[in-house]
């Protein structure tokens, strides 16, 4: 018998609530991208799993991060390359960045020696669909949606093959496919193209280059993705373009926001979730707490070029080590390469460091970063001014945006000297404006109605519940290029105007002939008679 203050109906209510929660749980298919792309995507997947959803992650058997023990169902498929092949191709890609930095937008990638790395990634999709047992399993499982990283295109192909609504999770989209597939207006007059390192306030010369890059992307980007599109066409048994693959996307979750990004128009199905990787700082381990405490009044500098850069050319590493030895701060440098012979006593090499936790410590004075989106947002969230050494991809643009906002200094990692790095560090540490600017950005970023992680989870669940989001799809998808720009209407109106002008002209000409042409003939006739 229940106590007097315990309603007999309460257990029933609890059961109904639990049942309703389970009834709303769905099945989600996840097609991720390896490397740092997976780190943040994994947090979204884990929260969805925690909320009761059934999650299946499809990954290649050869990868860096994807085959590590996970809390959800993982389905692997065999690939045609080994771990050594993957490491070798990626090393070629990284080595190329240490020889010459990416300039001129996306077009130089077409002939880059590092293109083999991308071709290897694109080949994963053929391997996935060659696994007939896995394909049959996916076909028999009633998924509600696909959660995907579009970098290697395979997730888009999977969504189209199984006719499932999809949610894209990415920092940004190469080429013009975001504006074409999501129909986001992207005027080249003030929206800089990716990899050009321009701001939204461009000179005439920059606007000219920006327009040429915009036109070049439309002319040549399909070549970069040719093998991916060919594989998709082979799988789907019909010719498809990259736009065909991107267009059905229900929701675009982009890891940026208007604290980092320049203001621009977006469509209602494009959701900004910048800072999703930022978390509340945890207490430091005894090892790192000891490093921080030993730094004294000068504090520490955190240095990391990301999880994908394991080694730096020896000469460049020694230049960096020399510069770090000239500042009074203790430097915690995440580095797994060969130890520079001139490493100073104030510089501590570690194979791993709790980056977000260190950046959140009050004794952190500066952050040396490669400007990847994860590091940039951790710097923003924790209010730490940055010295940025971008290497490839969106890192160039991220660095330019932070520099424009007065929150950091950008260095060309290939051309910089020890003096350049020393001066940059002293500038962001000693010039109070950098700290003030990054704190202002941090305040703006945190002033939001909902956390980015919760927002991302909401929209994934939204697509799962409603089997897509067709009501957010703009009608621009159904227009031809000349209808979109109203060229047919302009032509029609122009034809009317020209017709009216022509008629008026003819009427005037006729009137003139009637009024003046007859008199002229009469006078002429009169003169001839007098002779």
Swiss-Prot record:
Sugar attachment sites: 293, 431
InterPro entries the UniProt entry points to: UDP-glycosyltransferase, UDP_glucos_trans, UDP_glycos_trans_CS
The keyword Glycoprotein is annotated on this UniProt entry: yes
Catalysed reactions, semicolon-separated: glucuronate acceptor + UDP-alpha-D-glucuronate = acceptor beta-D-glucuronoside + UDP + H(+); 17alpha-estradiol + UDP-alpha-D-glucuronate = 17alpha-estradiol 3-O-(beta-D-glucuronate) + UDP + H(+); prunetin + UDP-alpha-D-glucuronate = prunetin-5-O-beta-D-glucuronide + UDP; 5-epi-5-F2t-IsoP + UDP-alpha-D-glucuronate = 5-epi-5-F2t-IsoP-glucuronide + UDP + H(+)
Tissues and organs where the protein is expressed, per its UniProt entry: Widely expressed with highest levels detected in colon and kidney.
CDD domains noted in UniProt: GT1_Gtf-like (cd03784)
Gene3D superfamilies listed in its UniProt record: Glycogen Phosphorylase B (3.40.50.2000)
Swiss-Prot/TrEMBL GO biological process terms: estrogen metabolic process
Keyword Transmembrane helix assigned: yes
One cellular-component annotation, GO: endoplasmic reticulum membrane
Any one Gene Ontology molecular-function term assigned to this protein's record: glucuronosyltransferase activity
Top-level taxon in the UniProt lineage: Eukaryota
Location within or outside the cell: Endoplasmic reticulum membrane
UniProt-listed Enzyme Commission number(s): 2.4.1.17
Membrane topology, record value: Single-pass membrane protein
Family: Belongs to the UDP-glycosyltransferase family.
Subunit (UniProt): Homodimer. Homooligomer. Interacts with UGT1A1, UGT1A3, UGT1A4, UGT1A6, UGT1A8, UGT1A9 and UGT1A10 to form heterodimers.
Function: UDP-glucuronosyltransferase (UGT) that catalyzes phase II biotransformation reactions in which lipophilic substrates are conjugated with glucuronic acid to increase the metabolite's water solubility, thereby facilitating excretion into either the urine or bile. Essential for the elimination and detoxification of drugs, xenobiotics and endogenous compounds. Catalyzes the glucuronidation of endogenous estrogen hormone epiestradiol. Involved in the glucuronidation of F2-isoprostane (5-epi-5-F2t-IsoP). Involved in the glucuronidation of the phytochemical ferulic acid at the carboxylic acid group.
Entry protein name: UDP-glucuronosyltransferase 1A7
Native source organism of the sequence: Mus musculus
Lineage: Eukaryota, Metazoa, Chordata, Craniata, Vertebrata
Underlying gene: Ugt1a7
